[in-house]
């Protein structure tokens, strides 16, 4: 611990960690945000009904959750407008119960079976888009270069948000809860930008 490195404040945690690693290992941090992640077929999930979106509804503390009624309104709008399914992964029994509460009476909202991290990565990689609260899987979806919308209710996305790009946006802030309509429209903008980038 004899050597220290100065990392500028005012950037989010991912950027600051990238900058720190660049200094420690002596390279210039690339301006682009391409992480180059791939998901091995070993994580393959069977019977995923395409097209689908993923709702990352669970997080480390209750103050970072988005209200169940907002999730339900968003999922209904996604299904009505996009004719799609929405998968809800979970990691423990409390998260499973929340997923079941969100999906109750919505046949297109599918509570996932328990899965490992590789399977979760596969689910994210093959989704049209991902919506999520402040959680690690949201950052994984961002690193996989998927269309993502981060929902922040108790943390500042400037510090902990996804890496913003044409296909990745943050909404909300401490005490600022975004509406389902705003999340939907922002997600559609991200999906459109992703589809536009694939046109040759």
Predicted feature locations:
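Catalytic machinery of carbohydrate-active enzymes
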Residues: 1-200
């Amino acid at each position: 611990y004899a050597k220290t490195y100065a990392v500028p404040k005012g950037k989010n945690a991912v950027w600051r960690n990238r900058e720190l690693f660049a200094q420690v290992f002596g390279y210039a941090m690339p301006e682009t945000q391409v992480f180059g992640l791939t998901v091995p077929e070993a994580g393959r999930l069977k019977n995923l009904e395409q097209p689908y979106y993923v709702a990352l509804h669970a997080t480390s503390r209750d103050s970072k959750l988005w209200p169940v009624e907002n999730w339900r309104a968003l999922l209904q709008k996604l299904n009505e407008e996009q004719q799609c399914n929405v998968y809800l992964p979970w990691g423990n029994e409390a998260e499973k119960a929340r997923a079941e509460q969100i999906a109750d009476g919505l046949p297109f909202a599918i509570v996932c079976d328990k899965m490992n991290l590789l399977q979760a990565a596969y689910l994210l990689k093959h989704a049209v888009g991902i919506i999520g609260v402040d959680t690690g899987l949201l950052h994984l979806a961002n690193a996989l270069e998927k269309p993502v919308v981060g929902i922040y209710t108790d943390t500042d996305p400037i510090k902990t948000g996804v890496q913003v790009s044409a296909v990745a946006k943050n909404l909300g802030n401490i005490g600022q809860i975004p509406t389902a309509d705003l999340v939907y429209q922002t997600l559609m903008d991200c999906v459109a930008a992703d589809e536009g980038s694939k046109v040759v």
